[in-house]
Amino acid sequence: MLYQAASEAAQKRWTTSDFDIGKPLGRGKFGHVYLAREKRSDHIVALKVLFKAQLQQSQVEHQLRREVEIQSHLRHPNILRLYGYFYDQKRVYLILEYAVRGELYKELQKCKYFSERRAATYVASLARALIYCHGKHVIHRDIKPENLLIGAQGELKIADFGWSVHTFNRRRTMCGTLDYLPPEMVESVEHDASVDIWSLGILCYEFLYGVPPFEAREHSETYKRIVQVDLKFPPKPIVSSSAKDLISQMLVKESTQRLALHKLLEHPWIVQNADPSGLYRG
């Protein structure tokens, strides 16, 4: 079983008694996240508590194993750290970095949309994090506002690696979120790391307009708009032509023609708007 295999690989056997557990930070489909303090070091962490029964019922144990395997080996300022994990009879516990300023999704809802400076800073940070991931043969496959957190300095953190995959080849499985799916996944053809470029393009659009570009009332209509790349830029809010140019170069049906991430960092809109520190201070 994954929990035993995982724990034997861990150098330290943690238990709940190693932590002072504080307020809940959020809840998900399979459990809750709590603010916690590791007693010996006084280190503040986020403790993600998942219920085994629910994981087994939904047949997502393999997904959790993958998330743990991948995230525990990644070290990047824009990727949430997974420090370790442990389990008891009923639960699995993930010891995660605490992102003080919480979920980006809530921030976007509150603001409705972001300034170009803020959007560019976030997009550049994520491009750097994805370049790092792709260099380690990790495709994220589920970049969206709900999977991003904001750290104490205003830096963005990729938080959820549940759909990510360690790969050297092209894959065909359907995953990720409907509005963010690229044409090749909608059509169930092979895909590679360029799916993350598409998702980053969708995210950039949503940062600037407050909604994803191919949103429609019916799923079938969303699928159709994605496959046709039915990309429209509404008149409001006002967005620069340079930002639209970048988005248009990322949201290209032919995956090999999408703007490469290192080229994205050289795009005039990024160069002119993104804070080089990667921190958005407001």
UniProtKB/Swiss-Prot annotation:
Ranges of residues in domain Protein kinase: 19-270
InterPro entries registered for this protein in UniProt: Aur-like, Kinase-like_dom_sf, Prot_kinase_dom, Protein_kinase_ATP_BS, Ser/Thr_kinase_AS
Protein location: Nucleus membrane; Cytoplasm, Cytoskeleton, Spindle; Cytoplasm, Cytoskeleton, Spindle pole
Catalytic-site annotation from UniProt: D142
SMART domains: S_TKc (SM00220)
Phosphoserine: residues carrying this PTM: S164
Residues annotated for ATP binding in this entry: L25, G26, R27, G28, K29, F30, G31, H32, V33, K48
UniProt entry keywords in alphabetical sequence: ATP-binding, Cytoplasm, Cytoskeleton, Kinase, Membrane, Nucleotide-binding, Nucleus, Phosphoprotein, Serine/threonine-protein kinase, Transferase
Keyword Ribonucleoprotein found: no
Post-translational modification: Phosphorylation at Thr-173 may regulate activity and degradation of AUR2 in a cell cycle dependent manner.
Top-level taxon in the UniProt lineage: Eukaryota
Catalytic activity field: L-seryl-[protein] + ATP = O-phospho-L-seryl-[protein] + ADP + H(+); L-threonyl-[protein] + ATP = O-phospho-L-threonyl-[protein] + ADP + H(+)
Entries under Gene3D superfamilies matching the protein: Phosphorylase Kinase, domain 1, Transferase(Phosphotransferase) domain 1
Record-listed Phosphothreonine modification sites: T173
One of the record's GO cellular component terms: nucleus
Expression by tissue: Abundant in roots, flowers and flower buds, low or absent in expanded leaves, stems and siliques.
EC number: 2.7.11.1
GO molecular function, one term: protein serine kinase activity
Recorded family membership: Belongs to the protein kinase superfamily. Ser/Thr protein kinase family. Aurora subfamily.
Reported function: Phosphorylates specifically 'Ser-10' of histone H3 in vitro. Associates with cytoskeletal structures that are necessary for cytokinesis and with the microtubule spindle. Might colocalize with gamma-tubulin and function in microtubule organizing centers (MTOCs).
Protein name: Serine/threonine-protein kinase Aurora-2
